[in-house]
């Protein structure tokens, strides 16, 4: 029996060998080891080439290219070779005989050689693929979608057909590569329902994904970016896959992921730190323009000063060999780095002038914004840019492009525009989104200020244009009936237009759409309300109600955003205690998962509202945590770095003053002295005037001090001391500051008292003048940070008088006598 079995297997093997060797030409193709051998074989056997031979030859040519480093690939030479052209002609003639898999594979590989989408072979393959689409398997559909995406057909009916098929078979998809490829290509034609199904499917597949394939999660993150959908549970799974593969990533992959995270406003400190370290390791290994450009773009904004200088020196030696896209990437990175290397800026500006004519409008806008922010001193570049920008604006019929171009034109130094630009802006206003209108409002206001010499300015035309723009804004915002559209259009509005023109309409729309507020849009909605600086009780009550009810459905990372409007505006909703407790309990179990800077911001925001969860406070003021925070802040921009360090100091001060039982040490003395030194601006004329008024009221200039520094470095506008009979006490030494903690101690009732005490019954009085920033837009309710300062001053032993600048500058207080009477009443009749 065994002998018969062996004989049978041998017979079958011989049959297979004989069958495989019946196509000698295919056998010869399979043993080719270079493009030249393939072309030689094709040239000698054109008449004998079957559809199988053609497909195998094209696939083999791409295989050889793929195995080479990018810098050594010869795509252009292969594409222009006569035998490759012959292969394309043969393929076009044999399309109807191709198997489904072969058809898709040939289309995919032909596109790898940068064959244009309008090429007849590509068009015929696409049309045949469309005809066969319903019978394609999942792998073929996915690869076909990739081919369409590379031809910029994301919004085409054909892609819509693919999305419809995916909707029907999504439950059967079990391959993350197939799913992620489909997601990133059909994003432009899917419904919100299909989007959510795709996200859920990706979320489930990530649990079983081989983490070594980091391109799959990268495409998923790209899909989320394209959909503007920050779904954090899925993002975190993708991020975990990236963390496990950073050692295998090159600058290009790291640059792509960092860019995607920025677009999604997603930050993960562990990834940033590991990515920075990986990129620093590769600095000396990147010795060509392509790789060094990607390294510069990824590492530059995260690098320390020494590394930045090294990167700038390196990029300066390579800049002459850069193509237009690389120059644009470097310029954008320099802007993000706040680069001040004048030699590099000038060289980039000089090279850009050669390519301005080939950049798209959005790229021209990025260039203009960057060179303005970098303070470029190249008048010729500005002049060329203005001409090209105006030409693009006049020829464009896309409202978003017109608005974008108008905004950047107005940012150019001494820009003068002609009436055709104004006419174009006038014509597209009714079609503009709120974001577009905001950009145009900014541009028009700048043109008004520069006194544009045209009939639009001389006859009030620019004023009329601005009036029409405002009318369009009012009409558009009142017609919006979906809160997600409302948030999308207002998300990127910058400048004063929202505050000065649309604010009341925006709040009215919030009230009108209040029933559409859900746990899904709550964080973004809360951030918008914070931006408005408008205290609308019904809207804030709704936010608190939804958050309290559905807090378990909301990602813990969003807790800070939800709390923000309440603590900033100093508003406690009817269910205030339950709301704050729900938020606190929701986030406490996840402190180790939050980025360090977000933990600091969260703790500070709760401190504004007088909430000091011990677990949170102890987590912040921990040596290991502060070390992680320092490491993270090194990767931030200087502006964000300073902001977080300031919040940490303010939190440290609040805990020391309001929760001494926690025994958290004060460790910001040197930091505050540095801040004090940098901010030493002297006394303003208004302060000097009020100081004189106080001197007349109190009996002399030496009875009041100006710009007083307290323990823990609060600055008081004015200070005086009254005895138990409310009589002023003279300051013997005007130059002595009260910032020495060695002179104070804790007294009864939780107040700090000076060890060298005041006379019995005496009281320090702090007089604080609050400008408009201390109040919400629509009420006299004092905002959270100013109420915190008042609490702290009272703990330090002060009686605090907070005087509104609006009240001080009112018609009722328009004379010196009125000011003095007002101050006298506040100082001597307020209960001390």
UniProtKB/Swiss-Prot annotation:
Q: Which residues form the RAP domain?
A: 765-825
The record's subcellular locations are: Mitochondrion
Highest taxon, organism lineage:
Eukaryota
Q: Which GO terms describe its biological process?
A: mitochondrial RNA processing; regulation of mitochondrial mRNA stability
| Keywords annotated in UniProt | Mitochondrion, Transit peptide
S-S pairs: none
| Primary location recorded for the protein, binned into one broad class | mitochondrion
GO terms under cellular component: mitochondrial matrix; mitochondrion; ribonucleoprotein granule
InterPro entries recorded: FAST_2, FAST_kinase, FAST_Leu-rich, RAP
Q: Does the keyword Repeat apply?
A: no
GO terms of molecular function:
RNA binding
Q: Name one Pfam family in it.
A: RAP
Q: Which family does it belong to?
A: Belongs to the FAST kinase family.
Q: What is this protein called?
A: FAST kinase domain-containing protein 1, mitochondrial
Q: Which organism is it from?
A: Xenopus laevis (African clawed frog)
Keyword Ion transport part of the UniProt annotation:
no
Per the record, the domain comment is: The RAP domain seems to regulate mitochondrial mRNA levels.
Q: Report the function annotation for this chain.
A: May regulate the stability of some mitochondrial mRNA species.
